[in-house]
Amino acid sequence: MTVLPVPLDPTRLWAVMPSYDDVPERSLVEELLGHVGGLIIVDDGSHPRVASELRRIATQTGVELVRHGDRRGKGAALRTGIGAALERSPRPDALLLIDADGQHRPEAVPAFLAAGSTAELVIGDRFADLAAMPWQRRLANQVSQRVLELTTGRLVRDTQSGMRLLRGRALDLPLPGDGYEAESGQLKTALVDGLDVTWVPIPTVYGGERSSFRPIRDSARVLAALIRPVERPNVRPVLPPRPAAADDSV
């Protein structure tokens, strides 16, 4: 079945930027605001100096800043930001998830919007330049790619990219786990549930910045999230009232 494109209005696209001890450049935030209707930065319990810098950036650019009192993990920060964004009125038609460390460039947003006219989940694909990725991250990504293909029966590309666009059913996808495994669990649920998932090329940008990703511990959690069955919300079904039988009254 051919899916007819539904153009996305950039003014109805909100961005969510989780941050733990990362301060986005003001120029990056301002450029991003030229592509989206609003931005929510989630400070995931950063150290005081970084928290102060994030407040400064938010004040200078007029974006919304939400702060966790202590570090909860990227998955928790994404849930906080997505929840806050979806409470906007009017409700956004789509959300863009983007990291604060400068790896994700605002100039890629139009490609995400174009792909989002037919797909429900759009993910940045760094596989065109794997050599620029640290070997630990490259290995973890390639292993998780194979595991996800085996467990879902669908071909996938970059499974670890944090730059994503969500629309339609993808806006309600769960983020199981508080760490980096949340994004992997989100992708697996989308694939299992038959959502239209696609990838768009983005640059592979790694500098000398410190990363909160712990290769052994976080890779193990990601792998576990890909192997375990898809989690469903524990919601009790609402049953219709049982018709009264003639012998119910004793």
Task: Describe each PLM feature range.
Residues M1-P18, D22-P24, L175-V250:
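Hydrophobic helical membrane-anchoring modules
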Residues S19-H35, R49:
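Short, well-formed alpha-helical segments that are part of the catalytic scaffolds
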Residues D21-E25, S46, K74, R105:
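Donor nucleotide-sugar binding loop of glycosyltransferases
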Residues G37-S46, V66-H68:
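Short beta-strand/loop segment that forms part of the nucleotide-sugar
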Residues D43-S52, G102:
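A conserved acidic beta->alpha catalytic loop
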Residues A58-Q60, A84-D93:
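Alpha-helix termini
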Residues G69-A84, P106-Y180, G207-R217:
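Acceptor/aglycone-binding surface of glycosyltransferases and processive sugar-polymer synthases
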Residues S89-Q103:
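Short beta-strand-to-loop acidic/aromatic patch adjacent to the donor-nucleotide binding site
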